Amino acid sequence: MESAITLWQFLLHLLLDQKHEHLICWTSNDGEFKLLKAEEVAKLWGLRKNKTNMNYDKLSRALRYYYDKNIIKKVIGQKFVYKFVSFPDILKMDPHAVEISRESLLLQDGDCKVSPEGREVHRHGLSSLKSASRNEYLHSGLYSSFTINSLQNAPEAFKAIKTEKLEEPCDDSPPVEEVRTVIRFVTNKTDKHITRPVVSLPSTSETAAAAASAFLASSVSAKISSLMLPNAASISSASPSSSRSPSLSPDSPLPSEHRSLFLEAACHDSDSLEPLNLSSGSKTKSPSLPPKGKKPKGLEISAPQLLLSGTDIGSIALNSPALPSGSLTPAFFTAQTPSGLFLASSPLLPSIHFWSSLSPVAPLSPARLQGPNTLFQFPTLLNGHMPVPLPSLDRAPSPVLLSPSSQKS
């Protein structure tokens, strides 16, 4: 029953319903009725309006409102007896509301006399209405999330799409390739291959490279110590060690007084590794390095060279003021004359501390221990430092401090 129903409609529904004959009944055919159990009728009205404290006094005061509207009037001399003023016409005033109210009351009480076939037809109509509204809702695009019904209908739609895809290609038309999206991870090959020379060693493992570098450092210190001997006749004893590594390559032999030791650290890139070449002759390029274009001899600028006397050989050591320990000054060391050491400029690898490998040479040499005024004594600084710039090939010139020695042999 509708919640917006009025009191007179509620009483009329109770009168039309045969179930509530023990609560209210007709007393005549002209629309007169009597409340047999007025309190029970008031409680039903309170339940309809959600008022639990409803009683007959409140119900009777509500009925007085319809007195003025000429809908219901009180029968004088009879208790709980009322009458619809225009009884035959009262049913025609709102027949639709009355009929709906009556059907709802009958369904609620469970005493409706509808046949089972009618109930099945009614239920089938309701289910078809619900399914139609559900399909319209799903195809309208207004829903924002999946529901159970949509998930149940999804496989059929997918199957239909698949069958249509299989039936599309015909025998008359040539086969058309399906457009497929393929994700491929390809390395970037457009970058220019930067030729980086590496140290050519027999073994490519890191342990072999570390062993070769340690052997190289020990051979360098041995050669410098033999260079500092006063009666050193030959310094080109690196042929056994050079045969073990491709980077140590002996050249054609020279006279003993002109034999020299080259220490080359050619750095083409500040971050790349390059081989150190120890040879008994002129410097040679590694076969793995690409040939570099040379300028004509007329346009080639030779790097400045410095000749140190034999008394200043001891200043090559680690803590010498002429060459600081933290200096990364690139240089060639070549014994051109018996009494002098030839110093030329060349870029030294930043990651190799060449001066640290030469640190134990001067103190451990036999000539160094002969006396306090020997040839290999460190020079004392009396007249200050004399900076001599040694410009490298591709870096700013780095000065080498040369201090005059007061003790000459």
UniProtKB/Swiss-Prot annotation:
Where, by residue number, is the motif CTBP-binding motif?
Answer: 275-279
> What's the name of the protein?
ETS domain-containing protein Elk-3
What is the organism field in this record?
Mus musculus
Q: Which protein family is named in the record?
A: Belongs to the ETS family.
Q: Which residues bind DNA?
A: 5-85
A molecular function annotated in GO for this UniProt entry is: purine-rich negative regulatory element binding
Tell me yes or no: is Translocase among this UniProt entry's keywords: no
Which terms in the GO cellular component ontology are assigned? mitochondrion; nucleoplasm; nucleus
Q: Which UniProt keywords apply?
A: Activator, DNA-binding, Isopeptide bond, Nucleus, Phosphoprotein, Repressor, Transcription, Transcription regulation, Ubl conjugation
Q: How does it assemble?
A: Interacts with CTBP1.
PANTHER family hit by this protein: ETS (PTHR11849), ETS DOMAIN-CONTAINING PROTEIN ELK-3 (PTHR11849:SF172)
Family matches, as SUPFAM superfamilies: Winged helix' DNA-binding domain
